[in-house]
């Protein structure tokens, strides 16, 4: 009787809203550590003024993230998703705590040694990011689109949250002795606590929600082997009978999935090439001096994060959601007009125009990302949705890596840039 009940769709999608809240928190946890690094970049610029922290740290982060997701996506169908995501969140927790230890051990002093240590911790962030993002998006892609949207929204919430906290801590500690360092340490301590919360939620709460159990059982019945440990954690055993019929459980290969969704993949790549060629390096080093002083870059980062958050929830408004594949491509390509707009605004415009441009960049980044991530998996079986989610994350991280590399081009012709 229990097994038959578990196979039925949950009444009125029971547990859906709890699952959406948990997914949002898990999304926050998958990016809060890295966003903390970006948001306290003003502190690292004071400690390491000659090493271009926002650009170098991002460039260190991305090869590890991209390399890891390539390996994990290739072996996606054989990987235990539960272990994968838990390892990722635990690695985030340890790495964020190590940033505090590193700063305390060096007493906030700069130099090449502490900077190499900082880069090593950032590399571990890259490993954790690829482990969690690919695992979570793949896992949620076999469920309802609202859960994917909530997770993607959580990524943006982490940015808005870290920006708000950074502005508060900067104001609170600005006039105190060693103020920027105290604010940064408080920041990292909060991030560590959030990561610990995510470990608990994913291990003990998320797998037991009725809607999550339903979709995972459905995926298992369609041939998915990645959800077995999650089902066991929810107290559901004896899944072998669900996956024995190989004729029903044949799935498209990764190559076939990629060919069918190549436009979505390339568009994700182009979205993040455009975004990361501007954010955050350009904002910290190429926007000049304005009335806001050293608050200027922080305000720009905060505006980007806030509008990115808004953009990830605008697809909930049905008439705003773009579902036509050609329209998505046109919207993605039109964002590249922002690059010359940023260049001329930095050179000739005032801070009001720059704030407007960064808001548009964030809004379109969030909106288009969620549109693609929620539309692409529709119509596929559970194992295919999981695989497609991982493939899309490859192109997303690839776009970030390419954008970070292109961001260095802004330094050409700038005095004392290197």
UniProtKB/Swiss-Prot annotation:
<comment type="similarity">
    <text>Belongs to the SLC29A/ENT transporter (TC 2.A.57) family.</text>
</comment>
<feature type="transmembrane region" description="Helical">
    <location>
        <begin position="112"/>
        <end position="132"/>
    </location>
</feature>
<feature type="transmembrane region" description="Helical">
    <location>
        <begin position="186"/>
        <end position="206"/>
    </location>
</feature>
<dbReference type="InterPro" id="IPR036259">
    <property type="entry name" value="MFS_trans_sf"/>
</dbReference>
<feature type="transmembrane region" description="Helical">
    <location>
        <begin position="326"/>
        <end position="346"/>
    </location>
</feature>
<protein>
    <recommendedName>
        <fullName>Equilibrative nucleotide transporter 3</fullName>
    </recommendedName>
</protein>
<keyword id="KW-1003">Cell membrane</keyword>
<feature type="transmembrane region" description="Helical">
    <location>
        <begin position="142"/>
        <end position="162"/>
    </location>
</feature>
<dbReference type="GO" id="GO:0005886">
    <property type="term" value="C:plasma membrane"/>
</dbReference>
<feature type="transmembrane region" description="Helical">
    <location>
        <begin position="392"/>
        <end position="412"/>
    </location>
</feature>
<feature type="transmembrane region" description="Helical">
    <location>
        <begin position="353"/>
        <end position="373"/>
    </location>
</feature>
<keyword id="KW-0812">Transmembrane</keyword>
<feature type="transmembrane region" description="Helical">
    <location>
        <begin position="264"/>
        <end position="284"/>
    </location>
</feature>
<keyword id="KW-0472">Membrane</keyword>
<keyword id="KW-0813">Transport</keyword>
<dbReference type="InterPro" id="IPR002259">
    <property type="entry name" value="Eqnu_transpt"/>
</dbReference>
<feature type="transmembrane region" description="Helical">
    <location>
        <begin position="86"/>
        <end position="106"/>
    </location>
</feature>
<dbReference type="GO" id="GO:0015858">
    <property type="term" value="P:nucleoside transport"/>
</dbReference>
<feature type="transmembrane region" description="Helical">
    <location>
        <begin position="20"/>
        <end position="40"/>
    </location>
</feature>
<dbReference type="GO" id="GO:0005337">
    <property type="term" value="F:nucleoside transmembrane transporter activity"/>
</dbReference>
<feature type="transmembrane region" description="Helical">
    <location>
        <begin position="56"/>
        <end position="76"/>
    </location>
</feature>
<dbReference type="Pfam" id="PF01733">
    <property type="entry name" value="Nucleoside_tran"/>
</dbReference>
<feature type="transmembrane region" description="Helical">
    <location>
        <begin position="291"/>
        <end position="311"/>
    </location>
</feature>
<comment type="function">
    <text>Nucleoside transporter that functions as a pyrimidine nucleoside carrier in all organs. Has high affinity for adenosine and uridine when expressed in a heterologous system (yeast). Mediates proton-dependent adenosine or uridine transport in Xenopus oocytes.</text>
</comment>
<keyword id="KW-1133">Transmembrane helix</keyword>
């Amino acid at each position: 009787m229990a097994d038959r009940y578990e196979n039925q769709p949950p009444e009125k999608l029971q547990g859906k809203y709890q699952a959406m809240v948990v997914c949002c928190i898990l999304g926050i946890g998958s990016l809060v550590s890295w966003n903390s690094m970006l948001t306290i970049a003003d502190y690292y610029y004071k400690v390491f003024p000659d090493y271009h922290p926002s650009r170098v740290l991002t460039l260190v982060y991305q090869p590890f993230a991209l390399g890891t997701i390539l390996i994990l996506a290739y072996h996606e169908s054989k990987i235990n998703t539960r272990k994968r995501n838990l390892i990722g969140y635990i690695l985030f927790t340890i790495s964020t705590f190590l940033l505090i230890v590193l700063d305390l051990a060096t007493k906030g002093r700069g130099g090449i040694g502490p900077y190499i240590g900082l880069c090593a911790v950032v590399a571990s962030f890259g490993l954790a990011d690829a482990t969690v993002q690919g695992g979570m998006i793949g896992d949620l892609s076999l469920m309802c689109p609202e859960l994917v949207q909530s997770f993607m929204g959580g990524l943006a919430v982490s940015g808005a949250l870290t920006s708000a906290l950074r502005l508060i801590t900067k104001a609170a500690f600005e006039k105190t002795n060693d103020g920027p360092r105290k604010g940064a340490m408080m920041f990292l301590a909060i991030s560590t606590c959030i990561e610990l919360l995510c470990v608990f939620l994913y291990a003990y709460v998320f797998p037991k929600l009725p809607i999550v159990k339903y979709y995972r059982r459905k995926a298992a019945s369609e041939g998915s082997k990645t959800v077995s440990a999650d089902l066991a954690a929810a107290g559901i055993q004896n899944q072998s009978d669900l996956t024995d019929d190989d004729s029903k459980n044949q799935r498209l290969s990764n190559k076939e999935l990629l060919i069918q969704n190549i436009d979505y993949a390339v568009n994700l790549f182009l979205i993040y090439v455009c975004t990361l060629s501007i954010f955050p390096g350009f904002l910290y080093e190429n926007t000049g001096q304005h009335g806001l002083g050293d608050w200027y870059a922080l305000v720009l980062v905060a505006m980007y994060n806030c509008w990115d958050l808004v953009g990830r929830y605008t697809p909930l408004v049905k008439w705003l959601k773009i579902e036509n594949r050609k329209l998505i491509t046109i919207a993605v390509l039109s964002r590249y007009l922002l690059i010359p707009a940023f260049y001329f605004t930095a050179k000739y415009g005032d801070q009001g125009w720059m704030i407007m441009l960064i808001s548009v960049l964030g809004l379109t980044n969030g909106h288009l990302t969620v549109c693609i991530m929620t539309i692409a998996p529709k119509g596929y079986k559970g194992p295919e949705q999981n695989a497609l989610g991982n493939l899309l994350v490859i192109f997303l991280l690839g776009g970030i890596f390419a954008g970070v590399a292109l961001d260095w081009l802004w330094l050409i012709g700038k005095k004392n840039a290197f």
